[in-house]
Design a protein with these regions (language model features):
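Conserved small/polar residues in nucleotide/adenosyl-binding loops
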Residues: 13-17
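Cys/His-rich metal-chelating microdomains
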Residues: 149, 164
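Short metal-coordination and nucleic-acid-contact micro-motifs, chiefly zinc-binding Cys/His arrays
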Residues: 136-140, 154
Length: 197
């Protein structure tokens, strides 16, 4: 069994890592296999996406998301409260997005030959004071607590040490994902430090 080497830590976050998480999420959505995204999503968001995906499976549909190109990603908002830090990342993305029947492959919605420009706000959360592990990006599949190969239970725990790694206690986890519509008013405050309770 191969274990990950000790990693250096940082108080910063990598935009490359955050983009990778977004792309892994889209690929898992198309594959209708939510397992790959488990280490990167907070419990509540994971359960919501899992339920949405089960509904696609129940209906016999596949939401195909392909040719994903993150054109722009920047820190839109940083917020901190007494326990957690929150990064809201703005992403401008161009990608194919359509729905097909799983058996006939007939296109039910959208156009497989067209790409759409979409905007998202992704909120990542981690416990205050935690440092980010420097590694090979989102593809690094090691437990942030014990360094064991990443095998996560359905409850979001490391199979080896039992640590719940999807809470933000070890690293940034995706806690919210919103599509930005033309009528969406963006919070332009930048940095928000809530007073300690």
């Amino acid at each position: 069994m191969m274990w990950c080497a000790p990693l250096r830590c940082s108080t910063t976050v990598s935009y490359t890592h955050l983009k990778e998480v977004f792309i892994i999420l889209q690929q898992a959505w198309t594959a209708r296999d939510w397992t790959p995204i488990r280490p990167f999503e907070k419990e509540e968001l994971f359960r919501m996406h899992e339920a949405q995906l089960r509904e696609y499976v129940r209906l016999g549909r596949i939401n195909v998301v392909e040719r994903i190109n993150v054109n722009q990603a920047y820190l839109h908002l940083y917020r901190r409260d007494a326990q957690y830090e929150y990064l809201t990342i703005y992403m401008a993305v161009r990608m194919g997005d359509y729905i097909i029947d799983e058996k006939t492959r007939e296109v039910l919605k959208g156009d497989p030959n067209r790409e759409y420009d979409m905007r998202y706000l992704l909120t990542f959360t981690r416990r205050l004071g935690i440092t980010t592990r420097e590694a090979g990006g989102a593809a690094c599949a090691c437990c942030p607590n014990c360094g064991a190969p990443m095998h996560i239970t359905n409850a979001g725990q490391c199979e080896y040490c039992g640590s719940d790694i999807t809470t933000g206690d070890f690293d940034w986890v995706l806690s919210n994902l919103d599509s930005v519509k033309p009528e969406t008013r963006l919070d332009e405050r930048g940095v928000v430090i809530d007073p300690p309770q």
